[in-house]
Curated annotation (Swiss-Prot):
Protein name as annotated: Keratin-associated protein 9-6
Known role: In the hair cortex, hair keratin intermediate filaments are embedded in an interfilamentous matrix, consisting of hair keratin-associated proteins (KRTAP), which are essential for the formation of a rigid and resistant hair shaft through their extensive disulfide bond cross-linking with abundant cysteine residues of hair keratins. The matrix proteins include the high-sulfur and high-glycine-tyrosine keratins.
Complex and partners: Interacts with hair keratins.
Annotated GO CC locations: cytosol; keratin filament
Pfam family, one: Keratin_B2_2
The family this protein is said to belong to: Belongs to the KRTAP type 9 family.
Region (16 X 5 AA repeats of C-C-[GSVRQ]-[QTSPHN]-[TPSGYC]): 4-158
Alphabetized InterPro entries for the sequence: KAP
Taxonomic placement: Eukaryota, Metazoa, Chordata, Craniata, Vertebrata
């Protein structure tokens, strides 16, 4: 595997393009002597941009699809994305005041109907306002396998 540093790199901070498949942008690598590219350790917050890698967990700058309640602030660390969010559940959105994942929304009498709102960067899931889990069920939020952003409104999908 190609290393992140070329001979002309600075000793402690190396700019490279070889992590594009993981980081989506040239990435700053703090350990230039031995760290291979395209590994989680190569990635810093500068890689939080659109077109996120589906197995990476990002902070709010990437509209994460991570299903666990706490995500790291740096990119390309898949440990908090072990479970994809393919169901209309609380996944980091404001669901009846909840910000953690895993519990169904909109079922309690104290909860208003909940939308699964997400920005879709290929390939992930998206449901926009109007896509009530009560009316659409689990088919509301489905993976997007289109080359660009897909949106869904009450189970009617469109891709831009």
């Amino acid at each position: 595997m190609t290393h992140c540093c070329s001979p002309g790199c600075q000793p402690t901070c190396c700019r490279t393009t070889c992590c594009r498949t993981t980081c989506w942008q040239p990435t700053i690598v703090t350990t230039c002597s031995s760290t291979p590219c395209c590994q989680p350790s190569c990635c810093v917050s500068s890689c939080c941009q659109p077109y996120c890698h589906p197995t990476c967990c990002q902070n709010t700058c990437c509209r994460t699809t991570c299903c666990q309640p706490t995500c790291v602030t740096s990119c390309c660390q898949p440990s908090c994305c072990s479970t994809p969010c393919y169901q209309p559940i609380c996944c980091g959105s404001s669901c009846c005041g909840q910000t953690s994942c895993g519990s169904s929304c909109g079922q309690s009498s104290s909860c208003a109907p909940v939308y699964c709102r997400r920005t879709c960067y290929h390939p992930t899931t998206v449901c926009l306002p109007g896509c009530l889990n009560q009316s659409c069920g689990s088919s509301c939020c489905q993976p997007c396998y289109c080359p660009a952003c897909c949106v869904s409104s009450c189970c009617q999908h469109s891709c831009c």
